Curated annotation (Swiss-Prot):
This is tRNA-specific 2-thiouridylase MnmA 3. It comes from the Bacteria. Coiled coil: none annotated. One of its GO terms (cellular component) is cytoplasm. The gene is mnmA3.
Amino acid sequence: MKERNKRVLVGMSGGIDSTATCLMLQEQGYEIVGVTMRVWGDEPQDARELAARMGIEHYVADERIPFKETIVKNFIDEYKQGRTPNPCVMCNPLFKFRVLAEWADKLDCAYIATGHYSRLEERSGHIYIVAGDDDKKDQSYFLWRLGQDILKRCIFPLGDYTKIKVREYLAEKGYEAKSKEGESMEVCFIQGDYRDFLREQCPELDTEIGPGWFVNSEGVKLGQHKGAPYYTIGQRKGLEIALGKPAYVLKINPQKNTVMLGDAEQLQTEYMLAEQDRIVDEQELFSCENLAVRIRYRSRPIPCRVKRLEDGRLLVRFRETASAVAPGQSAVFYDGRRVLGGAFIASQRGIGLVIIENKDKL
Protein backbone atom coordinates (compact mmCIF):
# COMPACT_ATOMS: atom_id res chain seq x y z
CA MET A 1 0.00 0.00 0.00
CA LYS A 2 1.32 3.45 -0.94
CA GLU A 3 2.14 5.77 1.96
CA ARG A 4 0.06 8.84 1.13
CA ASN A 5 1.94 11.29 3.32
CA LYS A 6 5.15 10.59 1.39
CA ARG A 7 3.59 11.06 -2.06
CA VAL A 8 4.16 14.46 -3.62
CA LEU A 9 2.64 15.68 -6.84
CA VAL A 10 5.12 17.93 -8.66
CA GLY A 11 4.06 20.45 -11.28
CA MET A 12 6.56 19.36 -13.90
CA SER A 13 7.28 21.63 -16.85
CA GLY A 14 10.46 19.83 -17.86
CA GLY A 15 12.55 22.91 -17.15
CA ILE A 16 15.46 23.50 -14.79
CA ASP A 17 13.43 24.34 -11.70
CA SER A 18 10.88 21.53 -11.76
CA THR A 19 13.62 19.00 -12.57
CA ALA A 20 15.63 20.12 -9.55
CA THR A 21 12.47 20.02 -7.42
CA CYS A 22 11.85 16.38 -8.33
CA LEU A 23 15.43 15.35 -7.62
CA MET A 24 15.60 17.17 -4.28
CA LEU A 25 12.36 15.63 -3.06
CA GLN A 26 13.46 12.17 -4.18
CA GLU A 27 16.60 12.61 -2.08
CA GLN A 28 14.41 13.48 0.90
CA GLY A 29 12.58 10.18 0.56
CA TYR A 30 9.37 11.32 -1.10
CA GLU A 31 7.58 9.34 -3.77
CA ILE A 32 7.25 11.72 -6.71
CA VAL A 33 4.36 11.91 -9.15
CA GLY A 34 4.86 14.36 -12.01
CA VAL A 35 2.02 16.19 -13.73
CA THR A 36 2.62 18.44 -16.70
CA MET A 37 -0.10 20.91 -17.54
CA ARG A 38 -0.37 21.43 -21.25
CA VAL A 39 -1.82 24.91 -21.57
CA TRP A 40 -0.18 26.18 -24.74
CA GLY A 41 2.14 24.95 -27.46
CA ASP A 42 3.61 21.55 -28.15
CA GLU A 43 3.52 18.18 -26.43
CA PRO A 44 5.59 18.18 -23.20
CA GLN A 45 8.17 15.71 -24.49
CA ASP A 46 10.99 17.02 -22.26
CA ALA A 47 8.97 16.37 -19.12
CA ARG A 48 8.09 12.83 -20.24
CA GLU A 49 11.72 11.98 -20.93
CA LEU A 50 12.90 13.43 -17.62
CA ALA A 51 10.24 11.52 -15.70
CA ALA A 52 11.30 8.29 -17.37
CA ARG A 53 14.94 8.97 -16.53
CA MET A 54 14.09 9.66 -12.88
CA GLY A 55 11.79 6.66 -12.69
CA ILE A 56 8.70 8.55 -11.59
CA GLU A 57 5.03 8.38 -12.54
CA HIS A 58 4.12 11.04 -15.07
CA TYR A 59 0.82 12.36 -16.38
CA VAL A 60 -0.21 15.11 -18.78
CA ALA A 61 -3.18 17.32 -17.96
CA ASP A 62 -4.45 18.78 -21.22
CA GLU A 63 -5.87 22.11 -20.07
CA ARG A 64 -5.52 24.10 -23.30
CA ILE A 65 -9.19 24.93 -23.77
CA PRO A 66 -10.04 25.97 -20.18
CA PHE A 67 -6.74 27.88 -19.93
CA LYS A 68 -7.59 29.90 -23.02
CA GLU A 69 -11.15 30.48 -21.81
CA THR A 70 -10.05 31.77 -18.39
CA ILE A 71 -6.46 33.03 -18.17
CA VAL A 72 -5.94 34.17 -21.76
CA LYS A 73 -9.42 35.71 -21.95
CA ASN A 74 -8.81 37.61 -18.72
CA PHE A 75 -5.45 38.83 -20.06
CA ILE A 76 -7.09 40.26 -23.18
CA ASP A 77 -10.10 41.68 -21.31
CA GLU A 78 -7.88 43.51 -18.83
CA TYR A 79 -6.01 45.32 -21.59
CA LYS A 80 -9.33 46.19 -23.22
CA GLN A 81 -10.33 47.83 -19.94
CA GLY A 82 -7.17 49.91 -19.76
CA ARG A 83 -5.60 47.77 -17.05
CA THR A 84 -2.21 46.04 -16.94
CA PRO A 85 -2.69 42.36 -16.05
CA ASN A 86 -0.27 39.89 -14.54
CA PRO A 87 -1.39 36.49 -15.86
CA CYS A 88 0.74 34.50 -13.38
CA VAL A 89 -1.09 36.10 -10.45
CA MET A 90 -4.41 35.08 -12.02
CA CYS A 91 -3.24 31.63 -13.07
CA ASN A 92 -1.80 30.39 -9.78
CA PRO A 93 -5.05 30.18 -7.75
CA LEU A 94 -7.60 29.92 -10.55
CA PHE A 95 -5.70 27.41 -12.58
CA LYS A 96 -2.27 26.02 -11.77
CA PHE A 97 -2.64 25.14 -8.09
CA ARG A 98 -6.32 24.26 -8.46
CA VAL A 99 -5.52 21.73 -11.19
CA LEU A 100 -2.53 20.38 -9.25
CA ALA A 101 -4.70 19.92 -6.15
CA GLU A 102 -7.33 18.05 -8.16
CA TRP A 103 -4.69 15.73 -9.60
CA ALA A 104 -3.08 15.28 -6.18
CA ASP A 105 -6.42 14.13 -4.77
CA LYS A 106 -7.01 11.84 -7.73
CA LEU A 107 -3.54 10.28 -7.44
CA ASP A 108 -3.60 10.07 -3.63
CA CYS A 109 -0.81 12.59 -3.05
CA ALA A 110 -0.73 14.46 0.25
CA TYR A 111 1.45 17.29 -1.01
CA ILE A 112 1.95 19.59 -3.99
CA ALA A 113 5.38 20.86 -5.00
CA THR A 114 6.50 23.38 -7.60
CA GLY A 115 9.74 25.04 -8.61
CA HIS A 116 8.81 28.46 -7.27
CA TYR A 117 11.61 30.42 -5.64
CA SER A 118 9.69 31.06 -2.43
CA ARG A 119 9.45 29.64 1.07
CA LEU A 120 6.68 28.96 3.57
CA GLU A 121 6.54 29.76 7.26
CA GLU A 122 3.98 28.73 9.86
CA ARG A 123 3.18 31.35 12.47
CA SER A 124 0.22 31.80 14.84
CA GLY A 125 -1.78 29.13 13.05
CA HIS A 126 -1.28 30.65 9.60
CA ILE A 127 0.91 29.64 6.66
CA TYR A 128 2.79 32.63 5.24
CA ILE A 129 4.53 32.91 1.90
CA VAL A 130 8.11 34.13 2.37
CA ALA A 131 10.39 35.60 -0.28
CA GLY A 132 12.98 33.17 -1.64
CA ASP A 133 16.67 33.61 -0.87
CA ASP A 134 17.46 34.59 -4.47
CA ASP A 135 16.25 38.19 -4.78
CA LYS A 136 16.57 38.06 -8.56
CA LYS A 137 14.33 34.98 -8.83
CA ASP A 138 11.99 35.43 -5.84
CA GLN A 139 8.42 34.60 -6.91
CA SER A 140 6.51 35.37 -3.73
CA TYR A 141 4.87 38.30 -5.56
CA PHE A 142 2.94 35.88 -7.80
CA LEU A 143 1.58 33.68 -5.00
CA TRP A 144 -0.37 36.09 -2.78
CA ARG A 145 -3.79 34.84 -3.93
CA LEU A 146 -3.21 31.26 -2.75
CA GLY A 147 -5.47 30.28 0.15
CA GLN A 148 -4.50 28.54 3.36
CA ASP A 149 -6.04 25.25 2.19
CA ILE A 150 -3.59 25.09 -0.72
CA LEU A 151 -0.56 26.47 1.14
CA LYS A 152 -0.90 23.77 3.81
CA ARG A 153 -0.19 21.19 1.09
CA CYS A 154 2.62 23.04 -0.68
CA ILE A 155 6.35 22.37 -0.71
CA PHE A 156 8.76 24.82 -2.35
CA PRO A 157 12.20 23.14 -2.26
CA LEU A 158 13.98 25.92 -4.19
CA GLY A 159 13.21 28.70 -1.73
CA ASP A 160 16.58 28.34 0.00
CA TYR A 161 18.55 28.25 -3.26
CA THR A 162 19.81 30.75 -5.78
CA LYS A 163 19.36 29.97 -9.47
CA ILE A 164 23.13 29.53 -9.77
CA LYS A 165 23.09 26.93 -6.99
CA VAL A 166 20.18 25.10 -8.65
CA ARG A 167 22.15 24.89 -11.90
CA GLU A 168 25.18 23.60 -9.99
CA TYR A 169 23.01 21.03 -8.22
CA LEU A 170 21.64 19.67 -11.51
CA ALA A 171 25.13 19.40 -12.98
CA GLU A 172 26.33 17.49 -9.91
CA LYS A 173 23.42 15.07 -10.29
CA GLY A 174 24.33 14.30 -13.89
CA TYR A 175 21.89 16.67 -15.58
CA GLU A 176 24.57 18.93 -17.04
CA ALA A 177 22.75 19.68 -20.31
CA LYS A 178 19.61 20.61 -18.39
CA SER A 179 21.61 22.85 -16.05
CA LYS A 180 22.76 24.97 -19.00
CA GLU A 181 19.32 25.65 -20.44
CA GLY A 182 18.08 29.23 -20.71
CA GLU A 183 15.36 30.89 -18.68
CA SER A 184 11.71 30.19 -19.38
CA MET A 185 9.44 32.87 -20.83
CA GLU A 186 8.05 35.40 -18.38
CA VAL A 187 4.52 34.79 -19.71
CA CYS A 188 4.24 31.16 -20.78
CA PHE A 189 1.82 31.74 -23.65
CA ILE A 190 3.51 34.76 -25.22
CA GLN A 191 6.60 34.84 -27.39
CA GLY A 192 7.71 38.37 -28.16
CA ASP A 193 5.62 41.52 -27.78
CA TYR A 194 2.27 41.16 -25.98
CA ARG A 195 0.73 43.62 -28.46
CA ASP A 196 1.30 41.17 -31.31
CA PHE A 197 -0.34 38.49 -29.19
CA LEU A 198 -3.39 40.72 -28.59
CA ARG A 199 -3.76 41.34 -32.33
CA GLU A 200 -3.41 37.65 -33.10
CA GLN A 201 -5.94 36.49 -30.50
CA CYS A 202 -8.32 39.44 -30.80
CA PRO A 203 -8.12 40.94 -34.32
CA GLU A 204 -11.25 43.01 -33.67
CA LEU A 205 -9.17 45.30 -31.43
CA ASP A 206 -7.97 47.14 -34.52
CA THR A 207 -11.42 47.34 -36.10
CA GLU A 208 -13.75 47.84 -33.13
CA ILE A 209 -11.43 50.04 -31.06
CA GLY A 210 -8.85 51.30 -33.54
CA PRO A 211 -6.72 54.43 -33.26
CA GLY A 212 -7.44 57.09 -30.64
CA TRP A 213 -5.92 60.26 -29.27
CA PHE A 214 -2.97 60.98 -27.06
CA VAL A 215 -3.98 63.87 -24.78
CA ASN A 216 -2.30 65.91 -22.08
CA SER A 217 -3.60 66.44 -18.55
CA GLU A 218 -5.84 69.28 -19.79
CA GLY A 219 -7.40 67.05 -22.46
CA VAL A 220 -5.63 68.75 -25.38
CA LYS A 221 -5.04 66.34 -28.28
CA LEU A 222 -1.34 65.68 -28.92
CA GLY A 223 -1.52 63.13 -31.74
CA GLN A 224 -2.93 59.72 -32.64
CA HIS A 225 -2.14 56.39 -31.02
CA LYS A 226 -2.81 52.82 -32.18
CA GLY A 227 -5.49 51.97 -29.62
CA ALA A 228 -5.74 52.20 -25.84
CA PRO A 229 -5.22 48.43 -25.20
CA TYR A 230 -1.68 48.66 -26.55
CA TYR A 231 -0.39 50.91 -23.77
CA THR A 232 0.44 50.62 -20.07
CA ILE A 233 0.81 53.13 -17.24
CA GLY A 234 4.38 54.41 -17.04
CA GLN A 235 5.25 53.40 -20.62
CA ARG A 236 7.80 55.64 -22.34
CA LYS A 237 9.20 53.58 -25.21
CA GLY A 238 7.22 52.80 -28.34
CA LEU A 239 4.82 55.74 -28.12
CA GLU A 240 5.87 56.97 -31.57
CA ILE A 241 5.12 60.60 -30.83
CA ALA A 242 7.59 63.48 -30.71
CA LEU A 243 6.85 66.11 -28.07
CA GLY A 244 10.34 67.54 -27.71
CA LYS A 245 10.80 65.89 -24.30
CA PRO A 246 10.34 62.43 -22.76
CA ALA A 247 6.66 61.51 -22.41
CA TYR A 248 5.08 58.84 -20.23
CA VAL A 249 1.65 57.23 -20.14
CA LEU A 250 -0.20 58.70 -17.15
CA LYS A 251 -3.75 57.41 -17.62
CA ILE A 252 -5.73 55.23 -20.02
CA ASN A 253 -9.42 55.84 -20.71
CA PRO A 254 -10.81 52.78 -22.54
CA GLN A 255 -14.29 54.33 -22.89
CA LYS A 256 -12.96 57.33 -24.79
CA ASN A 257 -9.97 55.43 -26.26
CA THR A 258 -7.62 58.16 -25.04
CA VAL A 259 -4.14 57.84 -23.55
CA MET A 260 -2.94 60.69 -21.35
CA LEU A 261 0.74 61.62 -21.60
CA GLY A 262 2.87 63.68 -19.24
CA ASP A 263 6.28 63.89 -17.63
CA ALA A 264 7.86 61.60 -15.03
CA GLU A 265 6.87 63.85 -12.12
CA GLN A 266 3.20 63.41 -12.97
CA LEU A 267 3.55 59.66 -12.42
CA GLN A 268 4.49 60.20 -8.78
CA THR A 269 1.90 59.59 -6.08
CA GLU A 270 1.66 59.21 -2.30
CA TYR A 271 -1.57 57.21 -2.29
CA MET A 272 -3.12 54.23 -4.04
CA LEU A 273 -6.45 52.38 -4.03
CA ALA A 274 -6.50 48.57 -4.11
CA GLU A 275 -9.31 46.00 -4.26
CA GLN A 276 -10.13 42.26 -4.23
CA ASP A 277 -7.59 41.66 -1.49
CA ARG A 278 -6.53 38.47 0.24
CA ILE A 279 -4.98 39.16 3.64
CA VAL A 280 -3.61 36.49 5.99
CA ASP A 281 -4.29 38.47 9.20
CA GLU A 282 -5.90 41.91 8.81
CA GLN A 283 -5.02 43.10 12.30
CA GLU A 284 -1.36 42.32 11.64
CA LEU A 285 -1.43 44.10 8.26
CA PHE A 286 -3.03 47.29 9.54
CA SER A 287 -0.77 47.54 12.61
CA CYS A 288 2.53 46.48 11.03
CA GLU A 289 5.19 49.16 11.59
CA ASN A 290 7.55 47.74 8.98
CA LEU A 291 4.93 47.28 6.25
CA ALA A 292 6.09 47.70 2.66
CA VAL A 293 4.37 47.09 -0.67
CA ARG A 294 5.55 45.94 -4.07
CA ILE A 295 3.49 47.43 -6.90
CA ARG A 296 5.09 45.38 -9.68
CA TYR A 297 7.27 42.29 -9.99
CA ARG A 298 10.91 42.93 -9.09
CA SER A 299 10.16 46.45 -7.88
CA ARG A 300 11.62 47.62 -4.60
CA PRO A 301 9.16 47.34 -1.68
CA ILE A 302 7.94 50.81 -0.67
CA PRO A 303 7.23 51.52 3.03
CA CYS A 304 3.52 52.18 3.52
CA ARG A 305 0.44 52.18 5.72
CA VAL A 306 -2.92 50.62 4.83
CA LYS A 307 -6.51 51.38 5.80
CA ARG A 308 -9.75 49.55 5.00
CA LEU A 309 -12.37 51.86 3.48
CA GLU A 310 -16.10 51.52 4.10
CA ASP A 311 -16.64 50.26 0.53
CA GLY A 312 -14.19 47.38 1.13
CA ARG A 313 -11.28 48.77 -0.85
CA LEU A 314 -7.86 49.43 0.64
CA LEU A 315 -6.28 52.89 0.78
CA VAL A 316 -2.50 52.67 0.73
CA ARG A 317 -0.38 55.62 1.82
CA PHE A 318 3.23 55.42 0.68
CA ARG A 319 5.83 56.71 3.10
CA GLU A 320 7.84 57.80 0.08
CA THR A 321 6.51 58.58 -3.38
CA ALA A 322 5.70 55.73 -5.74
CA SER A 323 5.78 55.93 -9.53
CA ALA A 324 3.61 54.43 -12.27
CA VAL A 325 0.86 52.85 -10.18
CA ALA A 326 -0.86 50.67 -12.79
CA PRO A 327 -4.43 49.39 -12.28
CA GLY A 328 -4.57 45.63 -12.78
CA GLN A 329 -1.13 44.97 -11.34
CA SER A 330 -0.77 43.44 -7.88
CA ALA A 331 0.06 45.27 -4.68
CA VAL A 332 1.77 42.72 -2.43
CA PHE A 333 2.38 43.62 1.21
CA TYR A 334 5.49 42.49 3.09
CA ASP A 335 6.77 42.53 6.64
CA GLY A 336 10.43 42.03 5.86
CA ARG A 337 10.42 38.99 3.58
CA ARG A 338 7.08 37.63 4.77
CA VAL A 339 3.97 38.20 2.65
CA LEU A 340 1.05 39.51 4.71
CA GLY A 341 -1.33 39.63 1.76
CA GLY A 342 -2.04 41.35 -1.50
CA ALA A 343 -4.65 43.09 -3.63
CA PHE A 344 -5.20 44.29 -7.17
CA ILE A 345 -4.38 47.92 -7.84
CA ALA A 346 -7.74 49.54 -8.54
CA SER A 347 -8.79 52.43 -10.72
CA GLN A 348 -7.57 55.60 -9.06
CA ARG A 349 -10.62 57.58 -10.19
CA GLY A 350 -12.02 59.63 -7.30
CA ILE A 351 -8.98 59.05 -5.10
CA GLY A 352 -8.68 62.78 -4.35
CA LEU A 353 -11.90 62.80 -2.32
CA VAL A 354 -10.95 59.54 -0.58
CA ILE A 355 -7.62 61.07 0.46
CA ILE A 356 -9.31 64.18 1.87
CA GLU A 357 -11.70 62.02 3.92
CA ASN A 358 -8.98 59.69 5.27
CA LYS A 359 -5.74 61.68 5.30
CA ASP A 360 -5.65 62.02 9.09
CA LYS A 361 -6.45 58.32 9.62
CA LEU A 362 -3.31 56.89 8.01
